[in-house]
Amino acid sequence: MKWRVVFCVVMGVILVFSTAVADDYNPPDWRGDLGTTYAKWSFDDGTNPSGPETGWVNPFGAPTLEVTGQLPLTEWKADDLGHQGVWKFEDYIQIEIANYDIDNPIKEIWIQVTYQADSIGQGLPLEISTNPGLTSIELVDQEAVDAFYYSETYSVILSPNPSFETIFIEPRNCTAYVDQVVIDTICTVPEPASVCLLGLGGLALLRKRRA
């Protein structure tokens, strides 16, 4: 009897811990470096629009997140399949981030989303877009949190680096239930070799115009 109690307690702790880790299970290697920002939303209540959780990092002010749409298609739920604090929506999530006004050629945005949708397993049910428009996007990883929820990580590249970006997360022809969103950004400086190549490219273009 005691072993059964101990087993149940241990399994409960493992389940809670694994879910918590999965929410921010894949942070970028560069988190905390110079020129980075960080923000996380766990939707503990239905505040909308909302600021990030305590611990966010951004010298230009707190970013904001808004879940768009109206009841009954857009609705905050205190619990969904064992996940506390979830937004159900069919419209889109909009995140606005003020950022470094630096003349860099590249910005990377690292997006983690923990969610469930009725079309998971039939192609990617989420569409990620940005303003200004993204240069490239890559699905870095997708892992099952439990029998219903997944955590996905996206790497988005903007070029050149903007001082303000808006991120949109939109379901593709389905209803999504989002448990957590984590956003990291970094304004990157190219390697010296890349700078040299950019310079040579510009010089070649200048010579061509003169010719």
Residue map of PLM features:
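Short, surface-exposed beta-strand/strand-loop-strand elements in extracellular ectodomains
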Residues: 121-134
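Short, threonine-centered small-residue motifs that mark membrane-proximal processing/anchoring sites
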Residues: 5-7, 12-23, 179-203
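Short beta-strands within extracellular/lumenal beta-sheet-rich domains
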Residues: 80-107
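A short beta-strand element within beta-rich, extracytoplasmic domains
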Residues: 102-118
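N-terminal targeting leaders for non-cytosolic proteins
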Residues: 22-86
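C-terminal membrane-anchoring or membrane-association module
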Residues: 205-211
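Short beta-strand-plus-loop segments that form exposed binding edges in beta-rich domains
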Residues: 168-176
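Extracellular carbohydrate recognition and processing domains
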Residues: 132-160
